[in-house]
Amino acid sequence: MHLPSSSSLYSSPTKSLFAMFLKARALSVTTQNPPDLFSLLHHSPNAKHLRHLHAHLLRTFLYSNVVLSSKLVLAYSKLNHLFPTSLSVFWHMPYRNIFSWNIIIGEFSRSGFASKSIDLFLRMWRESCVRPDDFTLPLILRACSASREAKSGDLIHVLCLKLGFSSSLFVSSALVIMYVDMGKLLHARKLFDDMPVRDSVLYTAMFGGYVQQGEAMLGLAMFREMGYSGFALDSVVMVSLLMACGQLGALKHGKSVHGWCIRRCSCLGLNLGNAITDMYVKCSILDYAHTVFVNMSRRDVISWSSLILGYGLDGDVVMSFKLFDEMLKEGIEPNAVTFLGVLSACAHGGLVEKSWLYFRLMQEYNIVPELKHYASVADCMSRAGLLEEAEKFLEDMPVKPDEAVMGAVLSGCKVYGNVEVGERVARELIQLKPRKASYYVTLAGLYSAAGRFDEAESLRQWMKEKQISKVPGCSSI
């Protein structure tokens, strides 16, 4: 039988094995445990050759060999035939053990079908006599992390305890990482503290989890504990440490971490470069951020967006727009953060038409505006004194405006003394946040500025009766 050349797909030993297999098949030679089949399946032959192997297994009844059949499932998955081919092979296996279940559950999890992976696990638990081992549970916990299915994660946790896997380092580590990924840091910390042995992966996960949730101080405490335990620091830890420094505005510490990275790393990778740039942006040291950005060997949308947002929030309209245009010229598509940067720049510059241009451009990139994008546009219109238009913009929003969006319009009303719009927006905000004194104070100020002193005094009296008071400011003098 003539087969197309596969020199680009196979090493010489594998090609020889397949030639031997074809010759043996032609002579109807069969064994119960042919090593060539294991080797061919392991090396993931192309789809055509794999179908030959599949047919041979069926014809010679070697399909009943659970290891061979499981390897066949894995081989199809490696060729991106996970669904439906791998799954079909799996369900047609005459016998399935934990090895075969682990393969199908793991492959669905690794291929991005987390929910399907969870469904398979639950089916194994309910419909078969097979019970999970300490390889199955980390696989399924990883799937729960990816799918953010908290209910499934809690259920698997209960099963882990019920089956006696609480002492397994593999399972406990997977549980900690799952809860970190879901943002349930109290659960993760309790498990972490109860573990007799902890490795650098766990410390890094906890540290990163705290920083991702904005708990920079708790993250730094975990970092110190990690250092006291003698674990080596790597680039993953440094990324989280830089994020913590950025959140706290700890420029001095951020510079120290930057120096450590330069001394230890011959070339800053993309993630480290992005983290250093973002740290300087959050500390409002944009010259340093730009220098790091320019010297990066590779930049992605995160690199560009971080700097564009920094200049936008700083009010540097020219630089924000310039970087946006350069990014598009390099063929990098903007994301939601990129547009937030240029919209913030528009708001600072009072560029209403430009803000509408960028806001509409989001649709061309299939980016659904978030509330913060609406807030930036509303802020831009309000700063320009277009308060009736801004109010209409709020009314036409496809989602209910939040405090930031309405607050931007109310601030504009305060600047321009627009009592009519300000009164309507303030009442919406008071309904949303009835205990927030600043909205009452702003509305009372609008009444007073318009000469409506009785209404202003009535509102202040009502605040006293409801015990709504503004938190007094502090002075260091």
UniProtKB/Swiss-Prot annotation:
This is Pentatricopeptide repeat-containing protein At4g14170. GO terms for molecular function: RNA binding. Keywords: Repeat. It comes from Arabidopsis thaliana (Mouse-ear cress). The keyword Repeat applies. Residues 405-477 are annotated as: Type E motif. NCBIfam families: PPR. The keyword Repeat applies.
